[in-house]
Amino acid sequence: MKDMPLQIHVLLGLAITTLVQAVDKKVDCPQLCTCEIRPWFTPTSIYMEASTVDCNDLGLLTFPARLPANTQILLLQTNDIAKIEYSTDFPVNLTGLDLSQNNLSSVTNINVKKMPQLLSVYLEENKLTELPEKCLSELSNLQELYINHNLLSTISPGAFIGLHNLLRLHLNSNRLQMINSKWFDALPNLEILMIGENPIIRIKDMNFKPLINLRSLVIAGINLTEIPDNALVGLENLESISFYDNRLIKVPHAALQKVVNLKFLDLNKNPINRIRRGDFSNMLHLKELGINNMPELISIDSLAVDNLPDLRKIEATNNPRLSYIHPNAFFRLPKLESLMLNSNALSALYHGTIESLPNLKEISIHSNPIRCDCVIRWINMNKTNIRFMEPDSLFCVDPPEFQGQNVRQVHFRDMMEICLPLIAPESFPSNLNVEAGSYVSFHCRATAEPQPEIYWITPSGQKLLPNTLTDKFYVHSEGTLDINGVTPKEGGLYTCIATNLVGADLKSVMIKVDGSFPQDNNGSLNIKIRDIQANSVLVSWKASSKILKSSVKWTAFVKTENSHAAQSARIPSDIKVYNLTHLNPSTEYKICIDIPTIYQKNRKKCVNVTTKGLDPDQKEYEKSNTTTLMACLGGLLGIIGVICLISCLSPEMNCDGGHSYVRNYLQKPTFALGELYPPLINLWEAGKEKSTSLKVKATVIGLPTNMS
């Protein structure tokens, strides 16, 4: 009991002390600002309870004259502060300073000599134009510096001297036109560098070599068209890199090979037109690959993504022209679990693509124009345990009988095992105007079972097979046509043809050079009859014009007195020899070659030719066949006569009906077999090259109408 007064005095003293401190704190807090304890994460992501002074959005013109002594975080965002004067009253424990969205125009107006403990400084959305030498050298403990969205056009080589503890540097959205590797000599511990959305003209070799501890590099939105092979040399600890929203037209494969520990790669929103063989290969630590939102991406070629033993996820979505993925595009990816391919222009995905991914757990191919035929039938064959994401958005676009149906609801037996090739409409444009001397590529890809072969036909009718190399043309094995140094002579119609055992598909592009076609010289067309037989005629032709369409028409009119048969054929323009077969002996024909040009004019020429007559042996053979045929016909008529006689003797049958049937049968008009069965049309195989007809059309005109 004697100790009670003492305890009361102690508690009273503590209460008075706390009250005095609270009053002092309240007095020190700047007017209109909020002073309180708030959660805060350090640059190294350590959580702490920090004494925070919040003076955001108050229209302040000057830095607060007095702050609580224990202030750790000072927020001055969205004011009109243009200068920070020297003061002896700066809190010595200040670790975070946010001066974003103010009116600062020079770093020299920011006096930070009394802020040695600062860890984070935010200077975003001010009017800073340059960083002079040693401008922040007193901040030896600084770990984060944000200078995004300023007007920086100049950074002195020694601007960051003294910031040897800096971990994060953000320079996005300024006016920098170059990157100087000397900037980084003073930043050996930098882990994150963001320098996107600057008008940087190009990146040079060894630009980032001093950043030996860099882990994340973001070079987004700076209109880069290429990355030098040695640009990333020295970044041995780099784990993540983003080239988002640049103008790269191909994967910077050689540069990426120098980053041996890369785990995350972002190439989203670049106009890369194809992922080529080996573009992503032997990157032993890569875990995630992003190739989304690429407006020009058409195909992912064979072995494009190869030997990435740690890759877990591929995202290739929202690519409006991505219409082809080679069956062997993804190879040696033992840990790949997630394959995102939704919202592209894919008509199919080969089963072989999926079979090559042993650990695949989920796939997304919805929102694609799926053609429900042989290539995609594996989906419904219950041969996979892979989870399809958003299956309710997976619909058939073709063929018409399945249009609008959910792919998973079409039975695999309703889809053929083999099917025609299909060249995606998005592969290349139908018309293109190019400048003289330029280089152009057309990427032709087709899906089918069996897999199709692809070749090209030039305006002159020249056939270009895969791996063909000339002075002007090169056809890649995948089907890409390169035209080098375009001149007016290269103008005209180029046709890609995809063919397999089932049939063929074609797609053409009309090229103008400097807005016009080559001059039309009213080129000649010559026809030559190379061989005449009793049942066939071999015809060839030559056109001086080099601007033919990809189809040639052939027609033949039989000029015998009673014949009305005519046939026609459309064939590729690279075929200039044609064999007309199954013709009638000793018969005069009119053969016409009709060649349309890109000027909507036609080169047409006709010749008359008479087939040979049959030799004596053939005549004797045909006579024997005719005798045999007549004997069989006589026997057949005899049997019919007996049947009719028996029918007449029967009281239940009408004899007149039988006589009427025989009479009608015998009165059938006669006609040549060639008129009823048009001659088969075969392409002439010249040498070892095999050409496939795109469309063969045979018609018979004016046959007798009362054949029954």
From Swiss-Prot:
Species annotation: Pongo abelii (Sumatran orangutan)
Disulphide bridges: 444-496
Annotated PANTHER family: IG(IMMUNOGLOBULIN) AND LRR(LEUCINE RICH REPEAT) DOMAINS, LEUCINE-RICH REPEAT NEURONAL 3A
Membrane topology per record: Single-pass type I membrane protein
LRR repeat locations: 70-91, 93-114, 117-138, 141-162, 165-186, 189-210, 213-234, 237-258, 261-282, 285-304, 310-332, 335-358
Keyword Cytoplasm attached: no
Signal peptide, first to last residue: 1-22
Protein name: Leucine-rich repeat neuronal protein 3
Keyword Metal-binding included in the entry's annotation: no
Record domain LRRNT: where: 23-69
Residues of this chain annotated as glycosylated in UniProt: 93, 103, 223, 382, 522, 579, 608, 625
Gene this protein is translated from: LRRN3
Any single GO CC term annotated in Swiss-Prot or TrEMBL for this entry: membrane
Xref: InterPro entries: Cys-rich_flank_reg_C (IPR000483), FN3_dom (IPR003961), FN3_sf (IPR036116), Ig-like_dom (IPR007110), Ig-like_dom_sf (IPR036179), Ig-like_fold (IPR013783), Ig_I-set (IPR013098), Ig_sub (IPR003599)
CDD domains referenced in this protein's UniProt entry, alphabetically: FN3
Keywords: Disulfide bond, Glycoprotein, Immunoglobulin domain, Leucine-rich repeat, Membrane, Repeat, Signal, Transmembrane, Transmembrane helix
Extracellular face residues: 23-628
Chief location category: membrane
Domain Ig-like C2-type, residue spans: 421-514
Membrane-crossing residue ranges in chain numbering: 629-649
Family annotation (Pfam families): fn3, I-set, LRR_8
Subcellular localization(s) per the UniProt record: Membrane
Gene3D superfamilies listed in its UniProt record: Immunoglobulins, Ribonuclease Inhibitor
